[in-house]
Amino acid sequence: MNQSKQLVRLIEIAIMTAAAVILDIVSGMFLSMPQGGSVSIMMIPIFLISFRWGVKAGLTTGLLTGLVQIAIGNLFAQHPVQLLLDYIVAFAAIGISGCFASSVRKAAVSKTKGKLIVSVVSAVFIGSLLRYAAHVISGAVFFGSFAPKGTPVWIYSLTYNATYMVPSFIICAIVLCLLFMTAPRLLKSDKA
């Protein structure tokens, strides 16, 4: 990759990181959960960069999003390992959706709606599931004391985190499908 393409990729990563953080802060003002988490479209910029540039750019954008969240203090932290799971691992994991970049781009370019929807929803599902898994582990280990008496810690963590992750997954999948059906050029990068 030549220097100008690298520069474009780095600028896009920076812009999408900022967009993800801003979207998360704004959504947290309206739909914030008591022990952290919110229904949010903050994953959209990370998915977008993953589809444009692939897994490495997606992982980088997610990692930077988590680091910026920590740096600005937009977090709910109990322990350093919990911080790592809920911010670094969870947000970076969204970038794994870049594994679907090729199929998403091909479906968008060929204007095959069915394939585009399947590719986007699959990618968003995997990215969301990996993020959810990091939050569930963190919740079970570090927030078990919040579980109602008699409720197993893992059940509490699975349920609590699903209350915001499932709607976030659905909203992100719908928005990205609509976005790419109407503007497939957003998926083009200098890499493609």
From Swiss-Prot:
Keyword match Signal: no
Transferase as UniProt keyword: no
InterPro entries assigned: Thia_Transptr_ThiT (IPR012651)
Effect of gene knockout: Cells display deregulation of thiamine biosynthesis and impaired export of thiamine products from the cell.
Subcellular location: Cell membrane
Chain segments annotated as transmembrane: 10-30, 31-51, 57-77, 81-101, 123-143, 164-184
Gene Ontology cellular-component annotations: plasma membrane
Topology within the bilayer: Multi-pass membrane protein
A GO MF term: thiamine transmembrane transporter activity
Pfam families the UniProt entry points to: Thia_YuaJ (PF09515)
Entry superkingdom: Bacteria
UniProt entry keywords in alphabetical sequence: Cell membrane, Membrane, Transmembrane, Transmembrane helix, Transport
Quaternary structure (record): Forms a stable energy-coupling factor (ECF) transporter complex composed of a membrane-embedded substrate-binding protein (S component), two ATP-binding proteins (A components) and a transmembrane protein (T component).
Stated role: Probably a thiamine-binding protein that interacts with the energy-coupling factor (ECF) ABC-transporter complex. Unlike classic ABC transporters this ECF transporter provides the energy necessary to transport a number of different substrates. The substrates themselves are bound by transmembrane, not extracytoplasmic soluble proteins.
UniProt family annotation: Belongs to the vitamin uptake transporter (VUT/ECF) (TC 2.A.88) family. Thiamine transporter subfamily.
Descriptive protein name: Thiamine transporter ThiT
Organism (species): Bacillus subtilis (strain 168)
